[in-house]
From Swiss-Prot:
Keywords linked to the UniProt accession: ATP-binding, DNA-binding, Helicase, Hydrolase, Mitochondrion, Nucleotide-binding, Nucleus, Phosphoprotein, Repeat, Transcription, Transcription regulation
Span(s) of short sequence motif DEGH box: 1408-1411
PROSITE patterns per UniProt: HELICASE_ATP_BIND_1, HELICASE_CTER
Gene behind the chain: MOT1
Species, as recorded: Saccharomyces cerevisiae (strain ATCC 204508 / S288c) (Baker's yeast)
Intracellular or extracellular location(s): Mitochondrion; Nucleus
Protein name (record): TATA-binding protein-associated factor MOT1
Amino acid sequence: MTSRVSRLDRQVILIETGSTQVVRNMAADQMGDLAKQHPEDILSLLSRVYPFLLVKKWETRVTAARAVGGIVAHAPSWDPNESDLVGGTNEGSPLDNAQVKLEHEMKIKLEEATQNNQLNLLQEDHHLSSLSDWKLNEILKSGKVLLASSMNDYNVLGKADDNIRKQAKTDDIKQETSMLNASDKANENKSNANKKSARMLAMARRKKKMSAKNTPKHPVDITESSVSKTLLNGKNMTNSAASLATSPTSNQLNPKLEITEQADESKLMIESTVRPLLEQHEIVAGLVWQFQGIYELLLDNLMSENWEIRHGAALGLRELVKKHAYGVSRVKGNTREENNLRNSRSLEDLASRLLTVFALDRFGDYVYDTVVAPVRESVAQTLAALLIHLDSTLSIKIFNCLEQLVLQDPLQTGLPNKIWEATHGGLLGIRYFVSIKTNFLFAHGLLENVVRIVLYGLNQSDDDVQSVAASILTPITSEFVKLNNSTIEILVTTIWSLLARLDDDISSSVGSIMDLLAKLCDHQEVLDILKNKALEHPSEWSFKSLVPKLYPFLRHSISSVRRAVLNLLIAFLSIKDDSTKNWLNGKVFRLVFQNILLEQNPELLQLSFDVYVALLEHYKVKHTEKTLDHVFSKHLQPILHLLNTPVGEKGKNYAMESQYILKPSQHYQLHPEKKRSISETTTDSDIPIPKNNEHINIDAPMIAGDITLLGLDVILNTRIMGAKAFALTLSMFQDSTLQSFFTNVLVRCLELPFSTPRMLAGIIVSQFCSSWLQKHPEGEKLPSFVSEIFSPVMNKQLLNRDEFPVFRELVPSLKALRTQCQSLLATFVDVGMLPQYKLPNVAIVVQGETEAGPHAFGVETAEKVYGEYYDKMFKSMNNSYKLLAKKPLEDSKHRVLMAINSAKESAKLRTGSILANYASSILLFDGLPLKLNPIIRSLMDSVKEERNEKLQTMAGESVVHLIQQLLENNKVNVSGKIVKNLCGFLCVDTSEVPDFSVNAEYKEKILTLIKESNSIAAQDDINLAKMSEEAQLKRKGGLITLKILFEVLGPSILQKLPQLRSILFDSLSDHENEEASKVDNEQGQKIVDSFGVLRALFPFMSDSLRSSEVFTRFPVLLTFLRSNLSVFRYSAARTFADLAKISSVEVMAYTIREILPLMNSAGSLSDRQGSTELIYHLSLSMETDVLPYVIFLIVPLLGRMSDSNEDVRNLATTTFASIIKLVPLEAGIADPKGLPEELVASRERERDFIQQMMDPSKAKPFKLPIAIKATLRKYQQDGVNWLAFLNKYHLHGILCDDMGLGKTLQTICIIASDQYLRKEDYEKTRSVESRALPSLIICPPSLTGHWENEFDQYAPFLKVVVYAGGPTVRLTLRPQLSDADIIVTSYDVARNDLAVLNKTEYNYCVLDEGHIIKNSQSKLAKAVKEITANHRLILTGTPIQNNVLELWSLFDFLMPGFLGTEKMFQERFAKPIAASRNSKTSSKEQEAGVLALEALHKQVLPFMLRRLKEDVLSDLPPKIIQDYYCELGDLQKQLYMDFTKKQKNVVEKDIENSEIADGKQHIFQALQYMRKLCNHPALVLSPNHPQLAQVQDYLKQTGLDLHDIINAPKLSALRTLLFECGIGEEDIDKKASQDQNFPIQNVISQHRALIFCQLKDMLDMVENDLFKKYMPSVTYMRLDGSIDPRDRQKVVRKFNEDPSIDCLLLTTKVGGLGLNLTGADTVIFVEHDWNPMNDLQAMDRAHRIGQKKVVNVYRIITKGTLEEKIMGLQKFKMNIASTVVNQQNSGLASMDTHQLLDLFDPDNVTSQDNEEKNNGDSQAAKGMEDIANETGLTGKAKEALGELKELWDPSQYEEEYNLDTFIKTLR
């Protein structure tokens, strides 16, 4: 069965295959847009999306639900009684009357049927369940549960269900067997054909499973519902409708008819567009809710045993019910009361089913923090969507059922144990109920019930139940607090007691409980209750007692809990009542400070810091009795100890001293008397959960200082934030305390042997100064003691930066360096044979160690070993060893150098961080020092070299502070130099700012293309990568600093820093009008740098700066875009593009007006190159922001895709490929604000062109200006419209309609029309452009006559010359060429006489069967590509036969460069597509293949048009292909077996040596021998045959002739087939007729046959051995290579016109192309082409327009031979070919071409692999079981892991089940 994938299907498949969620969502949203544009196709769209709701992949189901929601949102609400409300009897149109008549008759039929008890729709509701009958106890007692998978995967049912399982298994086997029989049955007469071994069944099962997994989802029939079935079962319903359909009224303006005007105005072509099979559904289409079918399918799936199907069904119902609950089950013809009742019953039935799922579902997915029950969550959302549409009575019933689910009263359920999953489901239902129907709860007094349920849930032992219970009240706390105080008090008491109990690390519910508590504490009512309780029980209920209960959760293992407790602390701090702040003390400060030091999560680290700052601020405001320094008196020292713990390097960690870590009063241990349990649930995982895992120490790596595990940045960031928090704390201390602390503690940190304390002390001092100055009035100075204490130490080290000691943290790197030095010395001894005594002594102890002395090993020692010592030792080596030892010594020496550089780098980074913070501090407490250089150098070094972003940003802030101080002190020159250096940092990365001197030589090249090829080449260069990394770091530092500078100085920055304006604009303005050739390297680099700086700084500029300084200079930038130097054009293009990303309207308006016209500048290559390069960079930098402007770019790009310059061509096509895929999205984009009016109008004009290009159905109808003698069908007129569109815009294309649809006729129409229009224009204008030019048709030689005949038939007014025949014939024809309108020639002639044909320019150059030029390297392809023509057109039924590369060759003829160079195409498309064909490729490679295929499809989409016969010809009879098997004859069998035995080993060896040409040749010869033998033994028995004598003996013994028909079973089979067709019947009954003395002869046979063979010899045997000997009455003709190509059309014509000719004998090569042989209705292949496309084309000679009979195709195949195997494979290939070639194009609406490429789709290839495996032996079949999957696992491990279906990560669950987001969708 062939896979059929239209463009719409491709769009739908993106729901599953999209590489990111953004892509998948976009695909889903486009489904909604399609539904909006084509509401009549809503059901069709839904049927395609529906299967994706039920797949295994989570994200696919969710995206499919989104698509369903988008589709149904655009369907009108269904109210069949709407007209009941409208009075009046206005007369309508005949169509309206017809509809009224249909409805009236329908009503009568309904009433009649009801009276006869045949149809009573109301009584059909008996299967619906009601809430009154919903009994929880019965449901739970039934024993039925819904787990993760069905009973086929797990034995979950009791003994009672054994029979069901057995029956299911039996049905499975029956189904598989029947499938096997149907597909593999070769010959009905062979009794053993249906007998299948167990192995075959197992293989079939696997194959079925694989194909199920790999084939695209087929649309599902969602139109059929119980209601529509009931309606259709009414008597005479169809007849009634049929009679109505044929009534006169229904023919008026009938939308089911296509009417096509013809050139001859007296004719109209009228065609039916609706197939009869669809008529039946249309009878009831307007009588039933259109979604009834899908609604019922989803209802059935809601109770599926597979959780994925349940989940998908719930999602689908949710989307359906949101808008369309009102329409469920309503039927036209019922009264409103009846419909209301039906609707109410159906919705009640849905509610009861949802509740049942709550009760029975047991599936849960454990994600990090909690369990998520996706089925129950989605069912709860569906219930919420349903509740909006239900009345009060049903809502109360649902609430009561949910309450039963939660409480599970044992008296009611009769079960001793409660089922927590049912409770969980009930709570989820109530959670959504509460959010949706808040007012309803108050109106019916249900809020107290809700509270009771919440309290019940909170008191359960299951975390998941507690978590949902807590979340129920969170959205309605403001309503809840209005209840009586006792209820609030109970809840608050419960929550605090829970927090006291939930003290283990796996309590996932803590976060939800804390969120609820935080919300409650926002309300004064709750605070009042807490105050009152505090007065009564101060020790228990004051905030001072309550808040410490939260402390243990600060370091909880679950991040959401840590976040919740921090948010709760902020909530408590924001309470306005001062009396609630009595819990602020030293302990909470210290615990939160520890949180900062220990937190690895960046978001929570920042939140911890914010909480700490809030604590300080509130303490300062509220507490006056105790100063902050008093509070910190006991905590300052321990905090500083922890903060100053050194941060080591890999190989040496420094752990925090645990005695300084304060633990909260409540520890992490479980109470010995109770242990909590995780909720037991069914999950896909069998991973055991270890016991006693309650405490997880998440802080262990941080406490241990584990650099390897955490990375340097994670640890450093916590210390930097800690230092900032510490500094902030100190800024609130009293001066006396500060002075003492600075003198006795902090200043000593500056002299510690570790670098970390020194750096952090620097940060503390600088941040302290900054905080202190912010807290005090402007102008007030820092206390003098700060400068006195720190200034001497810091200044000394800044002035003597080289006098730093070697820090202890550097010891590991020095030890590693020493090891490399020792290794070098050892190499001298081991390889260089140097005596030990000649080696220098290297100290064992390294600098930095505690015992290190003055002679300890350091970097200096290593440098001596590397240089001085190395040279001495090498000289002293024996000469005989020098050569041998040179390579090992150089390697070892290089490793020493690498280690030296590494050690220096580490030391430099650490000293740099220290000095930068010292410099920052001195600037703050001393102001500008006299010696600025040490300060500037330290800060700038940190900006350009610091790897930690926080430290780099702090250095940048200090540089900006320095610039401010310099400006205040009028030191403009110094500040200007700093800014100049910062701008220099932006230009060091040559990937961003090119090097002028290197690129100045390029003038007629596009630099973008050069840089891209260079970047690919440089990827593997390690040195370049390191330099690039350093340049990027420097650029990043410059950007950070300049961004801060722009923020601080604002719009006045260019006034305050004139040097910056100069850097930005002066060099551009100075050289604006200067010739590029006169610019020297220095000036050129300045210009390039200006562009680079402008690009980088533009995003930081204010709007006023942009308007006044940048937009006014666009003309200056434009001069450089037009420069003759590539580097200037590149810089200007990138600058424009980056500016457009920020200010799109201004830049794009200028681009459209001033720059796009340059793309058509024929006289200036630099204009075309610059403008094309700009568009390329616009598409890259703007990404989807370019959407509103895409419409302006397409046409100029199309023009440049055929540019004479290769670089322009390549870049234009690359750009076109990237933006063409955005065109479908452009239509929905509003005009950008501020876009000038004339551009808005222009956009509409451009859109008209684009719409025609992307959707030929929008192509303007082309009325033929001349009378073509043919009647065009609708689709043919559409094709001509498309060809006319291509003609108008000078585009070229491929018309690849299915064979037999009239490609020739459509081509004649456009050629003849254009010829006429050009002639008309020439007569008016005498323009050279419209002078008369002939058109050239190049086709296979057998079709030259066919084209001549077609032109004579349809356009006889055109003079046609067939330039074909031998050289002498062609010589006589050459004089006629100059006068011809049409020249028809063959490919061979075109190649041989290219010089003759090239003398003429052509209007059209048409390649018929254009796939012949698929090999781009062939002389033929190269020849036709040299022909000059205004328009190029390829006609082919099969544009791709084997390889996607063939498509490149076709487009290289049409538009050279459109698909890039062949090499580029290979890299971008062919390789990834080919790689994805291998079933063993990774999922990443598979996706790359799919994306490449999709990208290629989108790029070629506008230039290929394909329609299929079955889609455009409703009157074309079917084509039936059958295999006809025959056994080998005895002689053939003997020869075949002898050959295979002897040749098998030889062939095997040849296959091993298949790279050798001779080996390949031998294999081919062997295959050809076997192939010929299968046809006839005479074809192989040459005089040289080794067994000739044996054969002759055999023939003598049997008395047979070699050419006897007994020796040729294929001829016997052919005779039998012909007899069955009624051909040659006279020969059977000849004897009988002679006896009766009168002849039995039919002049015309019932059937006529085309008989195809590969070889002319085989045709001879059919003619001589069969027809002449055994079937002399058969009349026949022959068409093979011996017939002159010019005479072949005569043979065709005679055969078609003379029905008494029974058979036409053809060779596939000659008769398989382009010919119209509709006179035959039977096609018989005696021999077969190994390329299935050729056979496919051959059989379509008969199956084409004009054929009135069913076409039967017979393939005669010899059983048990190579032929059968090859044909089995070919049969598979034909399936793929069918996928590729016979794909529907959805008419012209999608102009689809991807089906032509689907041969390269991974899905199809997998099928091929399976087919080949099934042909293998049992070992191969067995091996299938154990192929490693993408995880690398096989066997049972693979199966086990395979059960773990892919779910989303927690963040995606949060997104899908976010209550607030969901509620918004309902409103």
